[in-house]
Amino acid sequence: VTPTEEISYAEMLENIRLFARYTPEQKEAKTIVFAENSVEWIYSFFSIWQNKGIAIPVDASSTVDDVAYILNDARPEAIWVSGQTEETARQAIEKAGVDTVVLRMDDLSGLAAHDETKETGISFEDSDVCVILYTSGTTGFPKGVMLTFKNLLVNIDAISSKEVPIFNKNSSTLILLPLHHVMPLVGTLVAPIFSESQVVLCPT
């Protein structure tokens, strides 16, 4: 649910498949998601998993230097951007001297209704690295923390099991915080989606 529309799971999957047509397809390909919270952010993120890639969420308020550092460290194949972050991303790519491809999520918004790709789900091995989160810690430059699907599934099970049924098909979760942080990413997006519950996207 967004301030302007309600999106079904079928519509979400259709949009993810559309975005996946532009996301790098090779297994373990790294792709940055550099944008403010939006439904396009969600489609971009899950399209990376659709193609068995590794997602790297980055703070939408990051500076050119911040993004250039992550680009140089992670060497991603592509970076999803919004209209607000595109210029910063392009300057960072030039500064880092990498060949990362810029993908504009705004260009795909509203096109999914015409997508005719075959319906396929997201498949993975528990040991596959699925996301790299850059965290600054207390000193020095941010460190890229690699998480596997098993890491996420353990957390999801802990809050969605019969013993602790925080998320279920009848629950609704409000996404308030930026999704590049692990807590909102897992706790307000991935876990509710895996539990087939409703998420409500707060405008940022």
Regions found by a protein language model. Name each.
Residues E116-Y134, F141, I166-S172:
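Conserved pre-ATP/AMP-binding loop-to-beta segment of ANL
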Residues F45-N51, P57, D73, H181, ...:
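Short hydrophobic alpha-helices that are characteristic scaffold elements of the AMP-binding
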Residues L153-S172, L179-T204:
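Conserved AMP-binding/adenylation subdomain of ANL enzymes
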Residues N15-L18, A35-E36, I56-L71, G83-T85, ...:
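ATP-dependent adenylate-forming carboxylate-activation enzymes
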Residues Q84-D126:
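ANL superfamily adenylate-forming
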Residues R21, A60-Q91, N155-L174:
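Conserved ATP-dependent adenylate/AMP-binding module captured primarily in the ANL superfamily
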Residues V1-E25, I32-S38, I42-F46, T63-A68, ...:
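Conserved AMP-binding/adenylate-forming core of the ANL superfamily
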Residues S8-E11, C130-D157:
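Conserved AMP-binding A3 loop
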